[in-house]
A protein has these predicted regions:
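Histidine-centered active-site/metal-ligand motif
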Residues: 216
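Short amphipathic alpha-helical "interface-anchor" segments enriched in bulky aromatics
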Residues: 25, 33-36, 191-195, 221
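Hydrophobic/aromatic beta-strand patches that form the interior of the parallel beta-sheet core
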Residues: 3-5, 75, 128
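Short beta-strand scaffold segments in enzyme catalytic cores
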Residues: 85-90, 222
Length: 251
């Protein structure tokens, strides 16, 4: 027979409080949580959202969060060129924000993602993308925003902010969020793994996050936080005129 037990330093009283305080002063939050509080969620050195996501998990905000047909779904994108594209699906319900779904794929064109949007049968509100969606491509002379418009996908542009400001906005937003455990599983794992590397020379974490497989989901999440905070007059609505009254993805 096997017995599994968890003994957290904050609960057992076996370690002197002064010793724990000293350990906190010498460790990062994640290191302390792993070493003294038996946290398996805080095991990524330099994790950017580790603390906030652990609090969301322990607070019961990573659970079953189904689609509510009474509220529109907003989408938040990081569009890659020859790389991954990531999409978060959210619903604002009062002061809470439900993160109900996540999708990521790579080496696919915009028609593929339009098909994915259709397949989910959500009632959509706004579709939001970063400023570089307006950059014109050399081959076609069109921006990806114009290409999306031709496909019936109507994007708004999220204001451009420094990465660190966007990260701070995301950290401040997470306490308001409820995540669907299953549909957001991949995206949540990316957020947990999103981190800064350690500089042995300066004995500190570098300012810029590591760019790896977790970055696309984290970038889309950052645009989500910035866009939600800045939504209103500062969000640039589409200026193009519709060719038809019917727009299945109208913002």
């Amino acid at each position: 027979d096997w017995l599994a037990a968890v003994y957290k330093a904050s609960e057992t009283g076996l370690l002197d409080q002064d010793e724990l305080t000293a350990a906190k002063s010498m460790m990062t939050y994640d290191q302390y949580q792993q070493e003294f509080e038996c946290s398996w969620n805080a095991n990524v050195p330099g994790a950017i959202y580790g603390k906030e996501l652990e609090e969301a998990t322990t607070g019961g905000r990573v659970s079953n969060v189904p689609y509510d047909p009474a509220h529109k779904v907003d989408t938040w994108w990081d569009l890659g060129i020859g790389d991954s594209t990531s999409i978060w699906y959210t619903q604002t319900v009062g002061r809470a924000v439900h993160v109900i779904d996540y999708y990521e794929n790579r080496n696919q064109g915009l028609p593929h993602y339009c098909q994915i949007l259709n397949s989910k049968n959500y009632l959509y509100g706004t579709h939001n993308a970063p400023h570089d969606i307006e950059v014109r491509e050399l081959g076609s002379g069109k921006s990806r925003r114009e290409v999306a418009w031709d496909l019936g996908l109507n994007f708004r542009v999220v204001p451009k902010l420094p990465i660190e400001d966007g990260i701070h906005a995301a950290q401040m937003l997470i306490p308001r969020l409820w995540f669907d455990r299953e549909k957001c599983k991949q995206g949540l794992e990316c957020l947990r793994q999103y981190h800064r590397s350690y500089n042995d020379r300066t004995r500190s974490f570098r300012a810029n996050p590591v760019h790896d497989w977790s970055s696309h989901a984290a970038d889309a999440f950052r645009y989500f936080a910035v866009g939600l905070r800045e939504s209103g007059p500062t969000m640039r609505a589409p200026q193009m005129q519709a060719m038809s009254d019917y727009d299945p993805f109208a913002a």
